[in-house]
Regions:
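Bacterial Sec-dependent N-terminal signal peptides
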Residues: 1-28
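Short N-terminal segments immediately surrounding and downstream of signal-peptide cleavage
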Residues: 23-46
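Acidic/histidine-rich, surface-exposed loop or edge segments in extracytoplasmic proteins
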Residues: 25-32, 92-106
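Short, contiguous alpha-helical
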Residues: 38-42, 46-49, 59-102, 142-190
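Well-ordered alpha-helical scaffold segments within catalytic/enzyme domains
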Residues: 47, 51-52, 86, 123, ...
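Residues within well-ordered alpha-helical secondary structure of globular protein domains
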Residues: 54, 77-80, 119
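Surface-exposed helix-capping loop/turn segments at secondary-structure junctions
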Residues: 54-61, 128-137, 175-180
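Acidic/histidine-rich alpha-helical segments that form the ligand environment
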Residues: 105-142, 149-162
């Protein structure tokens, strides 16, 4: 019985010590989550521009191996997917790049890639800022496969997708003997 009383007393003391800290924790509002998403898109844009500026213009056609996309094609794919996923998530009209920019040789110059990529990020930032939070829980049927996701999931998948393809281009830059940009996990380079 003495052990039980000591255990209960210890538990209550511990709980009373910890509870004030727990009760002061603040829940995130949907507006906070939306603001963080906008911040993440702004950071992702800056980070991707670092990548575009790091790769020399004459190396945009470089492929790590013949069977994969070139650096320019990776970035153009990223840009078109940004537009597709964010427009699907938000229903906000996106700029039209035409189809398969990554297969167009004229789109693969450094200046063209920079234009398409920055335009796509500007759209994503605007779409995130102007998305209707009250609709984030709605399910959307994807126009391929048999997939259905919430708008919020699509917003997150858009961020995930661009990070994946930007990350793939790290090896392209390294194979040129160039150090890739510092990570911008918390804003500036780390």
């Amino acid at each position: 019985m003495k052990k039980i009383i000591i255990s209960v007393t210890f538990f209550l003391f511990s709980f009373s010590f910890i509870f004030p800290f727990v009760s002061n924790a603040q829940a995130l509002s949907m507006a906070d989550i939306k603001a963080q998403m906008v911040k993440d898109w702004e950071r992702s844009k800056a980070y991707t521009i670092d990548y575009l500026n790091t790769m020399p213009a004459d190396k945009y056609s470089f492929k790590a191996v013949d069977s994969i996309r070139s650096f320019a094609q990776q970035m153009l794919h990223l840009a078109q997917a940004n537009l597709f996923l964010m427009s699907l998530a938000t229903d906000l009209k996106s700029p039209s790049f035409g189809s398969d920019r990554e297969k167009s040789p004229t789109a693969q110059t450094k200046d063209s890639v920079m234009y398409y990529v920055t335009t796509s990020y500007d759209y994503c930032i605007n779409a995130a800022k102007n998305s209707n939070i009250s609709k984030w829980g709605e399910k959307k049927k994807l126009p391929f496969g048999n997939y259905e996701e919430t708008r919020f999931a699509l917003l997150n998948k858009a961020l995930e997708h661009q990070a994946h393809h930007r990350g793939q281009t790290t090896i392209y830059i390294r194979l040129q003997g160039i150090k890739p940009p510092e990570e911008r996990l918390f804003g500036g380079g780390m």
